[in-house]
């Protein structure tokens, strides 16, 4: 007999304020004062974190937008330079890979690596894809959508990452 395991009522009720820490990406970012408050962190659950003080785009989490005329991905890669990033399109997917070797920072030595894969909508014009890195470390991958009668063209190719001198205009939803 299968038994459904449910969280206690207070965890279910406060779920939106304490999202799961399973997918946290705050490696090496340090602690905030609210991380150290025992009545907020340990009484609810060690697997939940208060996320009211961080914006989605400031946390390393990507934002994907797909409207009528374009497809855009915003990704915070502030710890990487354009030389550390590889963006390629393979069939219906865009793959973004970032890696920098061990380097010294304020607290010792650190190396970072990530790999993201996103499915492209079938009507994105793959010959007009672009990718840029803003001065504040926001990677913007975008491509226009084509009308339904045209072929979007699917092949594997690398997309160069260009550097912008101004900060990103991505909203911090």
Swiss-Prot record:
The keyword Protein transport does not apply. The modification Phosphoserine is found at residues 45, 122. GO terms for molecular function: metal ion binding; structural constituent of eye lens; unfolded protein binding. One of its GO terms (cellular component) is cytoplasm. Zn(2+) 1 binds at residues 100, 102. Acetylation at Lys-70 may increase chaperone activity. InterPro entries: A-crystallin/Hsp20_dom (IPR002068), Alpha-crystallin/HSP_16 (IPR055269), Alpha-crystallin/sHSP_animal (IPR001436), Alpha-crystallin_N (IPR003090), HSP20-like_chaperone (IPR008978). It comes from the Eukaryota. It is found in: Cytoplasm; Nucleus. Residues 153-167 have a biased composition (Basic and acidic residues). The modification Deamidated asparagine is found at residues 101, 123. Its main location: cytoplasm. Disulfide bonds: none annotated. GO terms for biological process: lens development in camera-type eye; negative regulation of apoptotic process; protein refolding; response to heat. The modification Deamidated glutamine is found at residues 6, 50, 90. Zn(2+) 2 binds at residue 107. The modification N6-acetyllysine is found at residues 70, 99. Residues 1-63 are annotated as: Required for complex formation with BFSP1 and BFSP2. Residues 52-162 form the sHSP domain. The modification N-acetylmethionine is found at residue 1. Keywords: Acetylation, Chaperone, Cytoplasm, Eye lens protein, Glycoprotein, Metal-binding, Methylation, Nucleus, Phosphoprotein, Zinc. The keyword Repeat does not apply. Belongs to the small heat shock protein (HSP20) family. Contributes to the transparency and refractive index of the lens. Acts as a chaperone, preventing aggregation of various proteins under a wide range of stress conditions. Required for the correct formation of lens intermediate filaments as part of a complex composed of BFSP1, BFSP2 and CRYAA. This is Alpha-crystallin A chain. It comes from Phocoena phocoena.
């Amino acid at each position: 007999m299968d038994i459904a395991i449910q969280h206690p009522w207070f965890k279910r009720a406060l779920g939106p304020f304490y999202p799961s820490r399973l997918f946290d990406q705050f490696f090496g970012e340090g602690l905030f004062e609210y991380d150290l408050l025992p009545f907020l962190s340990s009484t609810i659950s060690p697997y939940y974190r208060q996320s009211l003080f961080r914006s989605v785009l400031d946390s390393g989490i990507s934002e994907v937008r797909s409207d009528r005329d374009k497809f855009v991905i915003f990704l915070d890669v502030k710890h990487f330079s354009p030389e550390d990033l590889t963006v390629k399109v393979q069939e219906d997917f865009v793959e973004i890979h970032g890696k920098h070797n061990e380097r010294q920072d304020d607290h010792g030595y650190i190396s970072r690596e990530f790999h993201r894969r996103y499915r492209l909508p079938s009507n994105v014009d793959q010959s007009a894809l672009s990718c840029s890195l803003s001065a504040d470390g926001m990677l913007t991958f975008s491509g226009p959508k084509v009308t339904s009668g045209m072929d979007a063209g699917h092949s594997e190719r690398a997309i160069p990452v260009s550097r912008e001198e101004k900060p990103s205009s991505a909203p911090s939803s």
